[in-house]
Design a protein with these regions (language model features):
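Auxiliary Fe-S-binding modules of radical SAM enzymes
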Residues: 1-38, 43
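A basic- and aromatic-enriched beta-loop-alpha substructure that forms the phosphate/nucleotide-
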Residues: 20, 24-29, 90, 97-104
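Short linear motifs at secondary-structure transitions and domain/linker junctions
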Residues: 21-27, 78-81, 126-133
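Canonical Radical SAM [4Fe-4S] cluster-binding loop centered on the CxxxCxxC motif
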Residues: 25-89
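Conserved AdoMet/S-adenosylmethionine-binding subsite of the radical SAM
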Residues: 91, 95, 103, 112-176
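Short glycine-centered, acidic/aromatic-flanked micro-motifs in structured strand/loop junctions
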Residues: 108-109
Length: 176
């Protein structure tokens, strides 16, 4: 089971059985997918899988002195509305919403906190549909067993405002 943040697979219009969802995606359209808006693959039609949990707790001060936190705190450390799904069900949902989309973005939180399940998901997505897979990561964890199935890593290194829990602090400070 993968632990997903709320709206963990998005934007989709069909459920695991291929039936239309009662609620429209945030776009307001009965069209699955969106356009990757960042980085090298900017403009590529994509589906996203947002996993729950992060090994960091990013906060920072603005020039005006306001405290800000992670832009996806609901996926990182405020995971009250998270849920779990089996890898096979995620693959079915993706399959029913694929259309002409060939790109999957696995993001978080930090996906590599669930490395074994991410690896299993990537294996299934490659086996079933030959998707191009991007993983968006904070670059504090590297799991070699996953690397061979991932086509592109989108690294988002963190600054001194990221404060991981104690077990990860030494590694974080060395690799920052």
């Amino acid at each position: 089971m993968l632990h997903l943040a709320k709206d963990g697979i998005f934007p989709i219009t069909k459920d695991k059985d291929g039936k239309l969802l009662k609620e429209l995606p945030a776009s307001g359209l009965h069209v699955a997918g969106t356009i990757q808006g960042e980085g090298k693959l900017n403009g590529v039609p994509s589906l996203f899988i947002r996993l729950a949990g992060c090994n960091l707790h990013c906060t920072w001060k603005t020039l005006a002195g306001n405290t800000c936190e992670c832009d996806t705190a609901y996926a990182a450390f405020k995971v009250e509305n998270s849920f779990s799904l089996p890898v096979e069900e995620i693959v079915r949902i993706i399959g029913h919403n694929r259309g002409n989309i060939d790109h999957i973005v696995i993001t978080g939180g930090e996906p590599f906190l669930q490395a074994d399940k991410v690896r299993a998901l990537c294996l299934q997505l490659k086996k079933e549909s030959h998707f191009h897979i991007t993983v968006e990561t904070n670059a504090t964890l590297y799991v070699e067993e996953c690397a061979e199935m991932i086509d592109f890593f989108s690294l988002s290194p963190k600054l001194s405002g990221s404060v991981p829990p104690a077990p990860h602090m030494d590694h974080h400070n060395k690799t920052r």
